[in-house]
């Protein structure tokens, strides 16, 4: 528990300081957010606000992860070092952040709303997702456990649902496709949510808080752990405590970033941050074997994504009519006259309730047990 608190504290402090310095740098360089003319008129005042703040979050998370392990090793030379699961999650987070950075940089340098086109963005996301999935299904430990598995999971692996039903080769291929669906959905879900000051960062804080608790519990009830209640209900998740550490570090980093990102925002996370955060959330779901549960824990991102899908589908089916005043959903309420802060806080409440329901679903079997 001490390393988790230490990691969260280090990342919080580093982001608080680093973001302020980054804001000054971006202002000096003239790197500000471009605002679309067809968006809510209230957003025009945000034109020129520094963006790409996600770069600070990504860099801080990596640094805090290494520092926490270094300090833990200095205190106790027998303390475990960075895990394969930890490195894989950082790879996915940084890789998606790089895609977002390219998108942000094109927008800023050319002062337009379009960065990478949709096809290029999806291709880059898929390439990183494939690399992550292939690596995650390899690197077995001495117990034969790989960071990820071909089994489909809810709060744990679902009996009888294994993508390797027709052999290992097909199982790996199907897992790569399955993992990429989760990664693409999560990254774009967070990206769509990042439309109001503090909305995506605040909602993500609660999700990473949930994965911190999940990782701690999975570690305590890990197969082979002396604290496990029973070998029949233990978890076979690889490196759960290190995943909990990373979740706590990202939790702290986002709280620090939220200090500067809350309304009126001094900096935006940009696609650099939203894609990185979405990638990390997907990584936690895959590596902690809670893939379907993510639809509840990250339910706010699901609802906002669905609002876009419904808007586009309704528009095409009705020949130009709109279901919402504007999509994503948060902009619909803006155009209805809700204050930005009101929308953000109410969406946080909704997101928090969904996280609580997700945690309840995760722990439900233990209440019954």
From Swiss-Prot:
Coiled coil: none annotated. The keyword Glycosyltransferase does not apply. It comes from the Bacteria. The chain crosses the membrane at residues 2-22, 55-75, 82-102, 120-140, 163-183, 196-216, 240-260, 267-287, 292-312, 349-369. Pathway: Cell wall biogenesis; peptidoglycan biosynthesis. GO terms for biological process: cell division; cell wall organization; peptidoglycan biosynthetic process; regulation of cell shape. Its main location: membrane. GO terms for molecular function: metal ion binding; phospho-N-acetylmuramoyl-pentapeptide-transferase activity; UDP-N-acetylmuramoyl-L-alanyl-D-glutamyl-meso-2,6-diaminopimelyl-D-alanyl-D-alanine:undecaprenyl-phosphate transferase activity. It is a multi-pass membrane protein. Keywords: Cell cycle, Cell division, Cell membrane, Cell shape, Cell wall biogenesis/degradation, Magnesium, Membrane, Metal-binding, Peptidoglycan synthesis, Transferase, Transmembrane, Transmembrane helix. It catalyses: UDP-N-acetyl-alpha-D-muramoyl-L-alanyl-gamma-D-glutamyl-meso-2,6-diaminopimeloyl-D-alanyl-D-alanine + di-trans,octa-cis-undecaprenyl phosphate = di-trans,octa-cis-undecaprenyl diphospho-N-acetyl-alpha-D-muramoyl-L-alanyl-D-glutamyl-meso-2,6-diaminopimeloyl-D-alanyl-D-alanine + UMP. Pfam families: Glycos_transf_4. Its EC number is 2.7.8.13. Its cofactor is Mg(2+). GO terms for cellular component: plasma membrane. Disulfide bonds: none annotated. It is found in: Cell membrane. InterPro entries: Glycosyl_transferase_4 (IPR000715), PNAcMuramoyl-5peptid_Trfase (IPR003524), PNAcMuramoyl-5peptid_Trfase_CS (IPR018480). Belongs to the glycosyltransferase 4 family. MraY subfamily. Catalyzes the initial step of the lipid cycle reactions in the biosynthesis of the cell wall peptidoglycan: transfers peptidoglycan precursor phospho-MurNAc-pentapeptide from UDP-MurNAc-pentapeptide onto the lipid carrier undecaprenyl phosphate, yielding undecaprenyl-pyrophosphoryl-MurNAc-pentapeptide, known as lipid I. This is Phospho-N-acetylmuramoyl-pentapeptide-transferase. The lineage of its organism: Bacteria, Bacillati, Actinomycetota, Actinomycetes, Micrococcales.
């Amino acid at each position: 528990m001490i390393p988790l608190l230490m990691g969260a504290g280090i990342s919080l402090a580093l982001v608080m300081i680093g973001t302020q310095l980054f804001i000054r740098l971006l202002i000096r360089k003239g790197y500000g957010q471009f605002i679309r003319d067809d968006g809510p008129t209230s957003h025009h005042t945000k034109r020129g606000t520094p963006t790409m703040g996600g770069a600070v979050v990504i860099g801080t998370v990596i640094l805090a992860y290494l520092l926490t392990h270094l300090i833990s090793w200095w205190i106790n030379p027998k303390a475990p070092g960075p895990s394969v699961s930890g490195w894989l999650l950082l790879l996915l987070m940084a890789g998606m952040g790089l895609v977002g950075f390219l998108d942000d940089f094109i927008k800023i340098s050319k002062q337009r709303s379009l960065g990478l086109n949709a096809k290029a963005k999806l291709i880059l996301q898929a390439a990183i997702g494939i690399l992550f999935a292939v690596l995650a299904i390899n690197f077995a430990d001495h117990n034969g456990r790989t960071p990820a598995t071909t089994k489909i999971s809810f709060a744990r692996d679902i009996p009888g649902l294994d993508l390797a039903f027709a052999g290992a080769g097909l199982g790996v291929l199907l897992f790569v496709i399955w993992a990429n669906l989760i990664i693409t959905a999560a990254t774009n879900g967070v990206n769509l949510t990042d439309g109001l000051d503090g909305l995506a960062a605040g909602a993500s804080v609660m999700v990473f808080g949930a994965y911190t608790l999940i990782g701690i519990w999975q570690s305590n009830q890990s197969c082979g752990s002396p604290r496990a209640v029973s070998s029949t209900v233990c978890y076979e998740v690889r490196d759960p405590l290190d995943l909990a550490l990373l979740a706590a570090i990202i939790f702290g980093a986002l709280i620090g970033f939220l200090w500067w990102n809350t309304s009126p925002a001094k900096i935006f996370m940009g696609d650099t941050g939203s894609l990185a955060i979405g990638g990390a959330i997907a990584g936690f779901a895959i590596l902690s074997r809670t893939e379907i549960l993510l639809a509840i824990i990250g339910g706010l991102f699901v609802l906002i994504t669905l609002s876009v899908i419904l808007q586009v589908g309704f528009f095409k089916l009705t020949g130009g009519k709109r279901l919402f005043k504007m999509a994503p959903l948060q902009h619909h309420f803006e155009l209805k006259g809700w204050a930005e802060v009101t929308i953000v806080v109410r969406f946080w409440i909704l997101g928090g309730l969904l996280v609580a329901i997700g945690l309840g679903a995760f722990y439900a079997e233990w209440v019954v047990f």
